[in-house]
Curated annotation (Swiss-Prot):
Recorded metabolic or biological pathway in which this protein acts: Amino-acid biosynthesis; L-lysine biosynthesis via DAP pathway; DL-2,6-diaminopimelate from LL-2,6-diaminopimelate: step 1/1
NCBIfam families linked: DapF
Binding locations of substrate: 20, 53, 73, 83-84, 167, 200, 218-219, 228-229
Protein name: Diaminopimelate epimerase
Domain of life, per lineage: Bacteria
UniProt site (Could be important to modulate the pK values of the two catalytic cysteine residues): 169, 218
Listed EC numbers: 5.1.1.7
GO molecular function: diaminopimelate epimerase activity
Protein's GO biological process: lysine biosynthetic process via diaminopimelate
Gene coding for it: dapF
Organism expressing this protein natively: Xanthomonas campestris pv. campestris (strain ATCC 33913 / DSM 3586 / NCPPB 528 / LMG 568 / P 25)
Keyword vocabulary terms for this entry: Amino-acid biosynthesis, Cytoplasm, Isomerase, Lysine biosynthesis
Active-site residues annotated for this sequence: 82, 227
């Protein structure tokens, strides 16, 4: 698929990973990327195509990569990391013939990702090494990493773990994820001065040591059916606390992901689906 975002016609591919949905644009022909206004209109579910994020395919930035991609949230802002998006980009590149073989590398705004095709619709992505130091998240007001932080938020104390997966995450452990105050607490933490770059907020329920249920309130989007980097963040925070095993199944409203982390300086590996929905053309 190719795109010309300034002539009125925009060809795209609609995809999703566990319900986290994307509009994929190929900008490798030199077409300039969409500005924030156009990205927000394209992502609008009533007046545009509708998606959580827009993924733009671009020429690689590193020698080992077959292509690069950037991420636009539905409000027009940028994101540094998107695990479900990485799998969808990988599947798109395989279908278009850009990626040869079952193992290859793609560049995200955050880092270069090693990708492996496990079968026709399932991919694993090396998501990078999690960063727990507050300065790297970033999380203001704390000098050293902790398993649990506490912040006073509108008269209540919110307790959470925090980690960067290339983007900031707070993880709130709850007894029942279905009853979690996702929108209320998610929005409050995103607006809190302790998170100078805002934050993705996950609400995680440990079902058993090999299974976690999760809902995520994302920056620039709101609650989504799935968040790949959020699943990684929840898993590693819970692994760090000894609450779950090093290989865990994460159930989100839109589907399931598998997260593996050997510990400390190892990369987190996420596996899950990448689904083509349709190809289309949008008349702006």
């Amino acid at each position: 698929m190719s795109a010309d975002v300034h002539t009125g016609r925009l060809r795209f591919t609609k995809m999703h990973g566990a319900g986290n949905d994307f509009v994929v644009l190929d900008l490798r022909n030199g077409t300039p990327p969409p500005d924030a206004s156009l990205a927000a209109r394209l992502a609008d579910r009533h007046f545009g195509v509708g998606c959580d994020q827009i993924l733009t395919i671009e020429t690689p930035r590193s020698a080992e990569a077959v292509a690069a991609y950037r991420i636009w949230n539905s409000d027009g802002s940028h994101s540094q990391q998107c695990g479900n998006g990485a799998r969808c980009v990988a599947a798109w590149l395989v279908r278009e013939g850009t990626a040869q073989g079952d193992v290859f590398t793609i560049d995200s705004p955050f880092t270069a990702h090693r990708v492996e095709r496990l079968d026709a619709g399932t991919y694993s992505v090396a998501m990078g090494v999690p960063q727990f130091e507050p300065t790297q998240i970033p999380l203001a007001g704390f000098a050293h990493a902790r398993d649990e932080y506490a912040l006073p938020v509108h008269g209540e104390t919110v307790r959470f773990g925090a980690v960067s997966m290339g983007n900031p995450h707070a993880v709130v452990e709850v007894g029942r994820v279905d009853a979690a105050p996702v929108e209320r607490v998610g929005a409050l933490l995103q607006q809190n001065a302790a998170f100078p770059e805002s934050v993705n907020v996950g609400f995680a329920q440990v079902v058993d040591p090999a299974h976690v249920r999760l809902r995520v309130y994302e920056r620039g989007v709101g609650e989504t059916l799935a968040c790949g980097s959020g699943a990684c963040a929840a898993a590693v925070v819970l692994m760090h606390r000894g609450r779950v095993e090093r290989d865990v199944r994460v159930s989100l409203p839109g589907g399931e992901l598998r997260i593996r982390w050997a510990g400390e300086q190892a990369q987190v590996v996420m596996s899950g689906p990448a689904v083509f929905v349709f190809d289309g053309e949008w008349n702006q």
